[in-house]
Amino acid sequence: MTAQNENTPPPVDAVIAAQGLTKRYGKAVAVDQISFGIRKGEVFGLLGPNGAGKTTTILMMLGLTEISSGSVSVLGFNPARSPLEVKRHVGYLPDSVGFYDHLTAMENLAYTAKLMGLSLAERALRIADALSRVRLTEVAHKRVATFSRGMRQRLGLAEIIVKRAEIAILDEPTSGLDPQATIEFLELISELKRGGTTVLLSSHLLDQVQRICDRVALFKAGRIEMMGSVAELAVQVLGAGFVVEVEAEGAGIALKLSTIPGVTKVETLSADRYRMTAERDVRPDAASAVVAVNGALKRLSVDEPSLEAIYARTFQGKREGGVRHAA
């Protein structure tokens, strides 16, 4: 799959599909004819600086602001015509989470569950499960007014879990969190994905988003400049995706490495050292290739493409190093 731009139509199996989506405020264009699709179970990132159009795009998906032109579909529903249906299936975590500060965490979730029409028994089961999954069981009976921002964000995810939302839309979810809280929150997002939830998140914190997103759309001035996986964007923008170094003894290793699918270049650095440029992380394939020619593998390492370098090259024209090391 190659990187895409805003003119690429969404895939037919998309659970969220936007086509030519546009939002104008008078003469100002906040979102300019964007098209994209998000598949079931995918973590998709809307990335870009503040004011790039990410939040406005989210609000149109939720039916919370009018669409000027174009269309968007969420699980087959038109948010402009059926906002309540979208709300029933989608969990939304805004940049500033709104809870009743005078109520406890459990009471806030109980209020949400009651509005959903759940029985008392079902409410209790879902709330206990949600609080456990976001690690808030011990503070379930504390007032939300005493919560840190990180705890509020986790409570927001708990509400999405209580709803059993098919899609979770998270607007700048890690903004303002300390490093440890950020790590914990990103892991919770990964857990949602493993449970089959489709996740759309917006952020300007590139390194954090790179850890969890399957694909990203890079926003600038209301338009999608590029879209795809980080590896795909790296090949298109930086000319390389993953760089894998192999240290191994044996004959015919370079030739065997060059036959691995996704490898675009193999360099011989010394008698037993090789560098591969590839569209994906090919370390398992490289190890198998060395074994296949009866070689002796000594070391494997990979340099991953950096989303920050891709972003800088795309939007700022900076010629930065295109990799982030990971042994």
Please annotate each region the language model reported.
Residues 5-14:
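Primarily ABC-family ATPase nucleotide-binding module
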Residues 13-18, 23-221, 226:
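ABC transporter nucleotide-binding domains
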Residues 19, 75, 269, 301-303:
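Solvent-exposed beta-strand sheet faces enriched in polar/charged residues
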Residues 186-277:
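ABC transporter nucleotide-binding domain
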Residues 91, 108, 117, 156, ...:
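A generic structural signal for secondary-structure junctions
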Residues 2-6, 278-327:
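C-terminal coupling/interaction segments
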